[in-house]
Amino acid sequence: MAYIQLEPLNEGFLSRISDVLLCGWTCQHCCQRCYESSCCQSSEDEVEILGPFPAQTPPWLMASRSNDKDGDSVHTASDVPLTPRTNSPDGRRSSSDTSKSTYSLTRRISSLDSRRPSSPLIDIKPIEFGVLSAKKEPIQPSVLRRTYTPDDYFRKFEPRLYSLDSNLDDVDSLTDEEIMSKYQLGMLHFSTQYDLLHNHLTVRVIEARDLPPPISHDGSRQDMAHSNPYVKICLLPDQKNSKQTGVKRKTQKPVFEERYTFEIPFLEAQRRTLLLTVVDFDKFSRHCVIGKVAVPLCEVDLVKGGHWWKALIPSSQNEVELGELLLSLNYLPSAGRLNVDIIRAKQLLQTDVSQGSDPFVKIQLVHGLKLVKTKKTSFLRGTIDPFYNESFSFKVPQEELENASLVFTVFGHNMKSSNDFIGRIVIGQYSSGPSESNHWRRMLNTHRTAVEQWHSLRSRAECDRVSPASLEVT
């Protein structure tokens, strides 16, 4: 037979009654707290601190609150104890003291402003977002400093370095007829065509008209009999690989009909600017720039091509390029030999109107300020792009190499009179420029190896000014 153990009736009933009473007391207490919180709202900041503190507010905390309200005293860290004091003589807390309780610590915001800056207490103010203060403090001081300018400050400027030709500012907005009537430098007829199959640009210089006559040597009158124009073509910004037409004698209406090809990819050609410069070559071997035409190739249809008549505008480039020379240097320390190869030259300045140029190169070895040896190439007839490929050797001991200089001078051969000077460079101890110094330095660092480099020719006056070795040769 199974037995069932029954719970005593009285004990179960009493436990339920106690639970109901406890729940009712808890609900009443919570409702009272909510009512007090809703009815006692204020503008003060309430900081609720939970912990096993005495339910009664300690005296030290009451003193601090009263002082904050009055604003007459400031507590320092040494005046206020860090822990609350207990009233129990034996220092032990009763059971009511150890029970968890809550109390509110209230401070007025206005008390924060009443504290002096010397107070060690830290005030934390809320960050206001999107709120603009009516009173703004200036970042810069209200009193500005006076800028001191020396009396000779503006005297250091050179107006010629900053002067602009105002007449050229409105060239882009003028038509060719307006440019022609304003400057009266003439017109140039040319065409362009790009070959996609062979990746080259063809420029055809056809003719020019109404070119101004040159001025006589004394500058007193126009010299109608000595107008000898020619055209130089290049693709900016590259001015080294330029082309040059032949010289047309005694005319202001030259007909050139010459074609020139530039090996250049199509996309690169669209980033270039075609520059055609008309130059006059007189009987005194002076090369005077008449005018120029600049055409950005991105603005034209290169594949379709086209013909243009363009009015010449003034050019800021008064001096023309003298040409370039390709050299190779090699030194053999064991043999004490300095080997020089004259490979080629290009776009040399023309010196003879009737027969063109017959250029040759003279090489002169200068030790210190003393001329030691002179050699020269053969001359090539009727060309401004000569190809020599001639080698020369000079005896230079290694201990004398640092004092050696090589002077390269390009002349135009003339059967009737003395040879015409075209250009010069100096390489060695007294180099005529940075490019020449770099070539010499590379040769010294790489013995037994030929070092090639292009050099732009310079005028005689420029070389004489910067290189003492140029003064020792003719």
UniProtKB/Swiss-Prot annotation:
UniProt entry keywords in alphabetical sequence: Differentiation, Membrane, Phosphoprotein, Repeat
A GO BP annotation: vesicle-mediated transport
GO cellular component annotations of the record: exocytic vesicle; glutamatergic synapse; plasma membrane; postsynapse; trans-Golgi network
Modified residues (Phosphoserine): S118, S119
Similarity remark: Belongs to the synaptotagmin family.
A Pfam family assignment: C2
Tissue note: Expressed in brain and kidney.
SUPFAM superfamilies per record: C2 domain (Calcium/lipid-binding domain, CaLB)
Principal localisation: membrane
SMART domains listed in its UniProt record: C2 (SM00239)
CDD domains: C2A_Synaptotagmin-15-17 (cd08390), C2B_Synaptotagmin-17 (cd08410)
Gene name of the encoded protein: Syt17
PROSITE patterns for this protein: C2
Cysteine pairings via disulfide bonds: none
Record's keyword annotation contains Ion transport: no
Stretch list, region Disordered: 60-117
Membrane topology: Peripheral membrane protein
Purpose of the protein: Plays a role in dendrite formation by melanocytes.
Location of the C2 domain: 184-310, 321-455
Protein location: Membrane
Name by which UniProt lists this protein: Synaptotagmin-17
Native organism: Rattus norvegicus (Rat)
Compositionally skewed regions (Low complexity) per UniProt: 96-117
GO molecular function annotation: calcium ion sensor activity; calcium-dependent phospholipid binding; SNARE binding
InterPro entries, sorted: C2_dom, C2_domain_sf, Synaptotagmin, Synaptotagmin-15/17_C2A, Syt17_C2B
